[in-house]
Regions:
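Asp-based, Mg2+/Mn2+-dependent phosphohydrolase catalytic module
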Residues: 1-11, 23, 42, 46-52, ...
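N-terminal helical cap/lid subdomain that shapes the substrate entry/recognition surface
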Residues: 4-119, 124-127, 131-132
Length: 253
């Protein structure tokens, strides 16, 4: 008689504050991005574009991004990094038809943030999941294309663990919109009921996972204080290592 399939076949993760520890850095996003934006500014200047004052250009860009995220929350249509840059370029009269956006994104030179680290148990958990033959996915509400976030994953040594990696910026919808979960499940060839989703934001990660029918696990480390309100995860963990015995119990029914 053939073996029965495992009740849980795949584990999907959020990235920031789930696999990566951003504690103490959440309010430094502008400062973290500033040196990269300066590199983009230098690239545009070298290409012969007439640019405004560097500080004015930068602060305008972050206003564009803030407004884009506020708009996105109305229907969970994703913010797209290249589009926010183009919006800011247009505000200052730059001819976007003369800007090679792929080259501009590379000029931004995105890298892993030195102050951001893996959680202590990220690699041991991913190692165990791989050894136990789970399919592993990643879904992040990032406006950047996945190739830019891959730079971080490669730097942290975890890129090769994932069978599927998606950013909302690439897909066009952000969590909790069902489309981004459904895309990941389709690529993994796994039904929602046979997959676990682990994330730190109840209103995004957990609400979306619940709506699609995934087993939802809220990652709630001590430094995070997201309001759960009326959103109920199936399980709550405070560190990634707690996921392994939880999966074992799900497999054993």
């Amino acid at each position: 008689m053939s073996a029965q399939p495992k009740p849980i076949q795949a584990v999907l993760f959020d990235l920031d504050d789930t696999l990566l520890d951003w504690s103490g850095q959440q309010n430094r996003i502008a400062a973290i991005n500033r040196p990269h934006f300066d590199k983009l500014y230098g690239y545009l200047a070298a290409e012969g574009h007439s640019l405004p004052d560097r500080d004015v250009f930068f602060h305008s860009y972050f206003d564009v991004v803030k407004n884009a995220w506020n708009e996105a929350k109305k229907d969970w249509t994703a913010v797209n990094f290249a589009q926010t840059l183009q919006t800011n370029f247009t505000l200052f009269g730059l001819d976007i038809t003369r800007i090679d956006m792929e080259a501009a994104l590379h000029a931004y030179d995105w890298q892993a943030t030195p102050e951001v680290t893996l959680y202590q148990d990220t690699i041991p958990v991913l190692d165990t999941l791989r050894r136990q033959q789970y399919k592993i996915g990643l879904i992040t509400n990032s406006m950047m294309p996945m190739w830019m976030r891959d730079i971080e994953l490669r730097a942290y040594g975890i890129l090769d663990y994932f069978d599927v990696r998606l950013t909302s910026g690439d897909i066009g919808f952000m969590k909790p919109h069902p489309a981004i979960y459904e895309q990941a499940l389709s690529l993994l060839h796994v039904d929602a009921a046979r997959a676990v989703f682990v994330g730190d934001r109840p209103a995004n990660d957990i609400a979306g996972a619940n709506a699609v029918g995934l087993v939802s696990v809220l990652m709630s480390p001590p430094h995070l204080h997201h309001e759960i309100e009326d959103i109920q995860p199936d399980f709550i963990i405070t560190q990634l290592g707690e996921l392994l015995p939880l999966l074992e119990s799900l497999q054993n029914g």
